[in-house]
Amino acid sequence: MSYEVLESRKTYEGKIVTITVDKLRMPDGSEAYRETVIRKKNAAGVLAVDTDGRLLFVRQYRHPFREMLLEIPAGVIEEGESGEAAVLRELEEETGKRAGRAEFLCELYPSVGFCTEKIQLFFATELTAGTQKLDADEFVEIEKYTLEEAIAMIHKGE
């Protein structure tokens, strides 16, 4: 099966994303259009477990949904930075915890139908006190849950 990009038009370029509309030739010879959100930087997230066996989460406002959402600590991978270095940095910036160990778990493609974003996922342990360094426009609440509590929250849609 082959797909051919016949033309590509940039419709928006911002700080975080670029949006393109591409005209494609489909495998049957027909033509179709596809919108693509191109992330300028990929991201990394971390499942961090404290010494009491609880998972660390951050709750923060996410404007597209206009509500506070519970998330794992995560952030963009800066130019020249590894995914592991990014999660160690983000974990400390968001939660004030340093990880002695971070293990790569997998790479996720959360919205493959229209977005190029890739997220590297890590598992971190051996947490010690660090220094929380939030961005000026970043306000987070740190929450800790056991694995069982986190799974129950997922099942309840929380």
Q: What do these predicted regions represent?
A:
Residues 23-28, 108-130:
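Active-site-adjacent beta-strand/loop module that shapes the phosphate/pyrophosphate-binding cleft
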Residues 40, 45-89, 127-132:
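Conserved Nudix-box catalytic region and its N-terminal flanking loop in Nudix hydrolases
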Residues 11-45, 51:
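Acidic, metal-coordinating catalytic segment for phosphate/diphosphate chemistry
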Residues 98, 102-111:
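Acidic/glycine-rich phosphate/pyrophosphate-binding loops and surrounding catalytic core
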Residues 1-13:
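Extended interaction-bearing regions that mediate binding to partners or small molecules
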Residues 71, 121, 144:
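Short aromatic/basic micro-patch
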Residues 3, 30, 68, 79, ...:
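Nudix hydrolase/Nudix homology domain
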Residues 81-86, 94-101:
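Beta-rich strand-turn-strand
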